[in-house]
């Protein structure tokens, strides 16, 4: 087996599998205009029945996925507000739904969880590359890198604070600009 193929069949990390599961749930909920929790409950049942539509999750990954869904529902308005301020030159209607939903998921984690930013961004870029268009990974990376930088600046943290984890490989597209740190803050973001 070639090195590339060996790498392809390795299991996906628990948190990344949970993120991909939630991304699929979020995408399906948006397309069907169905409540996120209802889609999550259905997806969990489908997964438990052995259907491969959704990735199989162990108990820890499923718990993490449920936390993400709950947080996304609770903070959806604030997340969308931050994304509107961060993404310049694009409206949500102009964006691919895959890119928008990856951004929503990662923005929730960046703002409301203690997760280090680089692994969250890296997972988001991987999901965008897997499910999105040719430029999705680069676009998502650019938006999230700017958002991460702004969030760290808001709490007075040095941009070098996240250097313990590898930085994403792509750079921001020309039409993406970081949010204005002086703009109003979303409700209850995490303290870093």
UniProtKB/Swiss-Prot annotation:
<dbReference type="GO" id="GO:0031564">
    <property type="term" value="P:transcription antitermination"/>
</dbReference>
<dbReference type="GO" id="GO:0005829">
    <property type="term" value="C:cytosol"/>
</dbReference>
<feature type="region of interest" description="Disordered">
    <location>
        <begin position="154"/>
        <end position="192"/>
    </location>
</feature>
<dbReference type="InterPro" id="IPR011605">
    <property type="entry name" value="NusB_fam"/>
</dbReference>
<dbReference type="GO" id="GO:0003723">
    <property type="term" value="F:RNA binding"/>
</dbReference>
<keyword id="KW-0804">Transcription</keyword>
<feature type="compositionally biased region" description="Low complexity">
    <location>
        <begin position="159"/>
        <end position="184"/>
    </location>
</feature>
<protein>
    <recommendedName>
        <fullName>Transcription antitermination protein NusB</fullName>
    </recommendedName>
</protein>
<dbReference type="InterPro" id="IPR035926">
    <property type="entry name" value="NusB-like_sf"/>
</dbReference>
<dbReference type="GO" id="GO:0006353">
    <property type="term" value="P:DNA-templated transcription termination"/>
</dbReference>
<comment type="function">
    <text>Involved in transcription antitermination. Required for transcription of ribosomal RNA (rRNA) genes. Binds specifically to the boxA antiterminator sequence of the ribosomal RNA (rrn) operons.</text>
</comment>
<comment type="similarity">
    <text>Belongs to the NusB family.</text>
</comment>
<keyword id="KW-0694">RNA-binding</keyword>
<keyword id="KW-0805">Transcription regulation</keyword>
<dbReference type="InterPro" id="IPR006027">
    <property type="entry name" value="NusB_RsmB_TIM44"/>
</dbReference>
<dbReference type="Pfam" id="PF01029">
    <property type="entry name" value="NusB"/>
</dbReference>
<keyword id="KW-0889">Transcription antitermination</keyword>
